């Protein structure tokens, strides 16, 4: 049995390395886009709470006053904007969140080091204890394996795949560095959220027939698919 979530335009995506942020990319009409946010909040009131947001304005043409109004609209919904991208810096005022860029170019000097001192970077993380409510585990170098359960309100963020040998009640976000082949496996799904490379589904969207069953999730184009593990 395959539980397929019908493709639709994503309201937001995730982006993250040392942290995970929502990337909001508004489209016109802005009022309709805000209604989508309201619908998400209505289904899950805490979905955006405490999560930093990057506002990508590359798809809209807003004046300074328009950006101000949009920021106020998001703030009224308890959504915290960490930074803005996709606009000219002259469109922003000092009171707005900072303009995010790709960073400055730099020249790296090669420094000879003792090869014996070099240690290979771990490509996986093994957690032998349960991840309790409120805890956040971020490992962007590779896979994360949890031998226990992941509690409600807890969060696992991985650059690779996520393997949970227990119940997943919190959030699991795999492939956060753009790994389209990442997967999520768990022995019992009661998740608040599943995400791969930024494409996500919340508890309300996951097929109810899969609840409390062992499953795997993967990304097919821009559609998150979930199937039972037999």
UniProtKB/Swiss-Prot annotation:
Keywords (alphabetical) are: Cell cycle, Cell division, Septation
The alphabetized list of GO BP terms reads: cell morphogenesis; division septum assembly; regulation of cell septum assembly
Family matches, as InterPro entries: CAP/MinC_C, MinC, MinC_C_sf, Septum_form_inhib_MinC_C
- Does the keyword section mention Nucleotide-binding? no
Q: Does the keyword Nucleotide-binding apply?
A: no
- Can you tell which superkingdom this protein's organism belongs to? Bacteria
Describe the subunit structure: Interacts with MinD and FtsZ.
| Purpose of the protein | Cell division inhibitor that blocks the formation of polar Z ring septums. Rapidly oscillates between the poles of the cell to destabilize FtsZ filaments that have formed before they mature into polar Z rings. Prevents FtsZ polymerization.
Annotated family: Belongs to the MinC family.
Q: What is this protein called?
A: Probable septum site-determining protein MinC
Name the gene that codes for it: minC
